[in-house]
Amino acid sequence: MHVPDGCINAPVSAATGLISLGTIWAYIRSAKNLVADRLIALTGMMSALIFVLQMINFPIAAGTSGHLLGGALAVIVLGPSLGIICISIVVVIQSLLFADGGLSALGVNLLNMAVVTSLIGWLVISTWKKLFNEGYSSIISGSFIAGLLSVVFSSIAFVLEYAIGGTVAVPLGSVLIAMVSSHVLIGIGEGIITGLIVSLLLRVRSDLVYVNQNKENKNNPTSFYGIFILLILLLTLITPYASSSPDGLESVAESYGFN
């Protein structure tokens, strides 16, 4: 889902950068009162986990793959403020150190992958909890829906940006259908991964899951950090075996000639 350089023109790239920075700065300010040692550690570990997960592409159809975006997962575990900061850190590191997504497109990628996914993920999980009960099953099912919809809306955001500032003329209706279709499948994968990780965290350290209202915890904190580190190590080991097929955006871009 990383947008490369030259896909979106300079004015729109600059505008998305300003919107992203303004939104992220607002959440940084609101997070000042939330910062504690355990939250800093948890945010760092979530950033590392999502960073590794974004490197692992899973196949969704013949010749196409997808990977976790992580916005919904981050806000469910960390809350909206620290969640959006967590994903922003991941996107910036990927752009600056690994050239994953163009530097001139950093604002676009921050908006789509950090801001949109986090805000949609938080809106969905918050609404889901109001409509249904506060139990673990509600949180887990809501996590799946939040993950799915966050990816779909991120793909729609890209099409809107391309409609305004795309550098190559394309049939926007067809591109929208192709983007949403492929990202519904990717979103299902995102929802499953999000639900599984949230389920694991609820079992190990339920008090550290932000959306969980029952903060009582009787689990050993050592088991939480141990499992978290082990999960990151295992994911790192399987990264070389991830799908090498182009992701949803790359596949659509190749089909319509705006890559």
PLM region descriptions:
Residues 112-154:
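Short helix-perturbing small/polar motifs within transmembrane alpha-helices
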Residues 142-147, 157-218:
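Glycine-rich ThDP/TPP pyrophosphate-binding loop and its adjacent helix/strand module
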Residues 14-15, 40-45, 84-88, 111, ...:
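Hydrophobic alpha-helical transmembrane segments
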Residues 54-117:
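Alpha-helical membrane segments and adjacent membrane-interface helices in multi-pass membrane proteins
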Residues 153-156, 244-259:
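Juxtamembrane non-transmembrane "cap" segments at the membrane-aqueous interface
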Residues 16-29, 47-54, 118-123, 147-159, ...:
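Hydrophobic core segments of alpha-helical transmembrane domains in multi-pass membrane transport
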Residues 2-73:
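Hydrophobic transmembrane alpha-helices
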Residues 69-70, 135-147, 219-230:
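Alpha-helical transmembrane segments and their helix-start/interface "positive-inside/aromatic belt" motifs
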